[in-house]
């Protein structure tokens, strides 16, 4: 299990590096960013669950201008984080805000009642009505635990 998770993390970092470094003659943009998931505890069915350090929340987005052709977010855990029970009652939301930081659209993910060490969600392609930022957030038992955003500009 540990080597499998370490392999996934290594592959994810390699893909992220490729996406970030790959250039294109067209005006297409790709952004990939990761934010560490802070250690936290929560209760599920009377049991205390602990998420240790070693997990990263990664948000990838592709498109051009206000048009998003691909968007995905998820958690990858390595080392001690891969040994934990994971994230129970989780969901991933995508939110969109204007240049004044006012959220105008939310794509709320489905709440997954199972526990998963590597929760992930993709969102459908779309065209945004305005520039600003696109964010992905991980919720566990209804509490936002980590977010990662990308600015959408001309």
Protein language model regions, located:
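Secretory targeting and sorting signals
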Residues: 1-29
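Secreted/processed peptides and extracellular or luminal domains of membrane proteins
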Residues: 24, 61, 83, 94, ...
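Short, surface-exposed binding/anchoring microloops in extracellular/periplasmic proteins
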Residues: 30-100
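Extracellular and select intracellular beta-sandwich modules with Ser/Thr-enriched
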Residues: 34-36, 106, 144-149
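Solvent-exposed serine/threonine-rich low-complexity stretches and specific carbohydrate-binding patches
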Residues: 100-117, 151-152
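Short, solvent-exposed, Trp/other aromatic-anchored flexible loops in extracytoplasmic proteins
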Residues: 109-133
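Short, exposed beta-strand-loop hairpins at the edges of beta-sheets
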Residues: 125-129, 133-153
